[in-house]
Regions:
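Conserved segment of the thioredoxin-like fold in thiol-based oxidoreductases
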Residues: 111-139
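Non-globular targeting/processing and membrane-anchoring segments
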Residues: 1-108, 128-129, 142-251
Length: 251
C-alpha cells in the first residue's frame, strides 16, 4: 500500500489548513442545502394508514407521539428477507445501529420510528437481541410502504403534523442518501423545521433558539430552563466559543 509521505509538524499543519478551506466550503454548502429543504413544498397525506404497535393498532398520527415531526425508516424484517425469522436485513441492521438516542430528536419536537412487516412479537424479540429497545417500531398492515417509495428498498420519510393533526410529507431519501443519517444533526437537517437554531437560514416564524444551549445528556431533557443542567450547557458553549472552537470545519 502506497501511503502519503511523512512530513514535519509545520508541513502537516499547512496541509491541514489547506484542506480545512475546502471542508468549510462543504459545511456551508450543506447548510445551504438544508435551508432549501426547509422551503420545499409539502405533500398532504390523505390516506388513513393503520399500523400495529406494541399496544395495538396505531394511526400515522399516533406515530408522532404528540410531537410536530416524524422520521420513519423502512427496515426490512419480514418473510422473504435474508435471515428471517431470526434476524432482519443486515444493511438495515447496520443503519439502525447508527441511529442517535431518540431523546435528542424528541427535544426538537421530532420522533423517529422504524416500520417493518414483521409481527410485533418478532419485532420485540429482534429489538431485545440487538439492544434497540428504545426505538419505536411498528408493523405495516397496508400499502404505506409502497405509497411512500419504500416497498422494495430501504428509505427514510419525513412528515410534519400541524395543529389540526393534518399530516404532510416533507422529505424523502433512500439509497446512498441514508448513509449520511444516524446522528442528531443529520436527521434534523432533513426535517421541515431543521435544527431550530438561530443561526440557520429558516423561513420566518419557524421555532429557533440559540445554538447548542438546548443540548443535554439524553436522560436530562426534563431539566427546566435555569436548572443546573441548562446553565452548565450554556456556560460550556460560551467557554468553547471563547477558546476559538469555531475555527474547526464545522464553523
Amino acid at each position: 500500500m502506497h501511503m502519503p509521505p511523512a512530513v514535519s509538524p509545520q508541513e502537516w499543519k499547512a496541509a491541514r489548513e489547506e484542506l480545512l478551506v475546502e471542508e468549510k466550503e462543504l459545511t456551508h454548502a450543506r447548510d445551504a442545502l438544508a435551508a432549501k429543504r426547509r422551503r420545499m413544498p409539502r405533500m398532504a397525506v390523505e390516506k388513513d394508514d393503520v399500523f400495529e404497535g406494541p399496544n395495538g393498532p396505531a394511526s400515522l398520527v399516533d406515530l408522532f407521539e404528540g410531537r410536530r415531526q416524524l422520521i420513519v425508516y423502512r427496515f426490512f424484517f419480514e418473510p422473504g428477507v435474508h435471515g428471517w425469522p431470526d434476524g432482519g436485513c443486515p444493511g438495515c441492521s447496520w443503519i439502525a445501529d447508527q441511529i442517535t438516542h431518540p431523546a435528542h430528536l424528541n427535544a426538537r419536537d421530532t420522533t423517529i420510528a422504524l416500520i417493518s412487516r414483521a409481527p410485533q412479537t418478532d419485532i420485540g424479540r429482534w429489538k431485545a437481541r440487538m439492544g434497540w429497545e428504545i426505538l419505536p417500531w411498528y408493523t405495516l398492515t397496508d400499502d404505506f410502504d409502497t405509497d411512500f417509495d419504500v416497498g422494495e428498498w430501504h428509505g427514510t420519510n419525513v412528515f410534519y403534523r400541524d395543529d389540526d393533526d393534518r399530516i404532510f410529507r416533507t422529505y424523502f431519501v433512500d439509497g446512498r442518501g441514508d448513509e449520511a443519517l444516524g446522528g442528531t444533526w443529520a436527521y434534523l437537517d432533513i426535517t421541515a423545521l431543521g435544527r431550530q437554531e438561530d443561526w440557520e437560514d429558516t423561513p420566518e416564524g419557524y421555532p429557533q433558539s440559540p445554538a447548542n444551549v438546548w443540548l443535554r445528556r439524553h436522560d436530562e431533557y426534563d431539566a427546566p430552563a435555569g436548572s443546573e443542567a441548562a446553565e452548565a450547557m450554556a456556560v460550556q458553549v460560551e467557554r468553547g466559543r471563547a477558546a476559538g472552537q469555531t475555527k474547526s470545519s464545522g464553523s
